[in-house]
C-alpha cells in the first residue's frame, strides 16, 4: 500500500487529514504508516498547517479495527467477527472511532473523500460500509425532498424554503480497490466480492483488465505494477 502511495503525486495540502486503517495485530503496517507520513511531510516543504497550532502529527491518524477473520478461525464464528470489523469500519468512516482524532477545521465533511484499499476481508468491510453510508444519505435526501414537497406546493413558499434550507453536507466516499499483485489471471475472493461495488477496481496484470461483474457494469482498470 505504501509503495503505491509513494508513486502517487498526492498533495498533502489538498488531502489535509488522512486515516490509516490496520487490522488488529498488524503492528508492522501501523509503524509503516507513521514512517510514510514522516517522510512524505518532509518532502512537502510548501505544506502549511492551520493557524490554530495543528502540526504534522495531527494531520493523520492510525486506527486499528478487529480482524474480519483470523487465521484458522472457524467459519461458524467468522460472521460475528466480520460484523465487528464492519461496525468498526463504519465508525471510522463517520469519524467516531475511539482512536480517531478530531479532523482539522479545514475539512468540509466528517466523511473521507477517497478510500484506497488493497487489504483482504477488511477491505470488503470498508468498501461495503462506505456504500451503506452513501445509500443512507441518498435515501435520506429523497425522503427529505418528498416530505417538503408534500407539505408545501406553492411556488413562493418553495422559494423561501430553498433560501432558508441549510446546505447539504458534502461527502464523497469514493472507493478504490487495488487487486493483489499475486492475482495474475483470476480474482481473489475479496476482489470477486468487491467487483460490483468498488467505484474503481485496479488490477496489476493485463489478463485481469476489462473484466466486469456483469454486463453494463464498470470494467476493471489495468494500472501496471503498483508495488515495489
Swiss-Prot record:
Keyword list (alphabetical) reads:
Endoplasmic reticulum, Membrane, Nucleus, Transmembrane, Transmembrane helix
Subcellular localization(s) per the UniProt record: Endoplasmic reticulum membrane; Nucleus membrane
- One Pfam family this sequence matches: Alg14
Q: Which residues lie on this side of the membrane: Lumenal?
A: 1-74
Which InterPro entries did the record assign? Oligosacch_biosynth_Alg14
Q: Which domain of life is it from?
A: Eukaryota
Transmembrane stretches, start-end = 75-93
Q: In Gene Ontology terms, what is a biological process of this protein? A: dolichol-linked oligosaccharide biosynthetic process
Membrane-topology annotation of the record: Single-pass membrane protein
Q: Name one GO cellular component term.
A: nuclear membrane
Function field:
Involved in protein N-glycosylation. Essential for the second step of the dolichol-linked oligosaccharide pathway. Anchors the catalytic subunit alg13 to the ER.
Q: Which family does it belong to?
A: Belongs to the ALG14 family.
PANTHER family reported for this sequence: GLYCOSYL TRANSFERASE-RELATED (PTHR12154), UDP-N-ACETYLGLUCOSAMINE TRANSFERASE SUBUNIT ALG14 HOMOLOG (PTHR12154:SF4)
Q: How does it assemble?
A: Heterodimer with alg13 to form a functional enzyme.
Q: What is this protein called?
A: UDP-N-acetylglucosamine transferase subunit alg14
Name the gene that codes for it: alg14
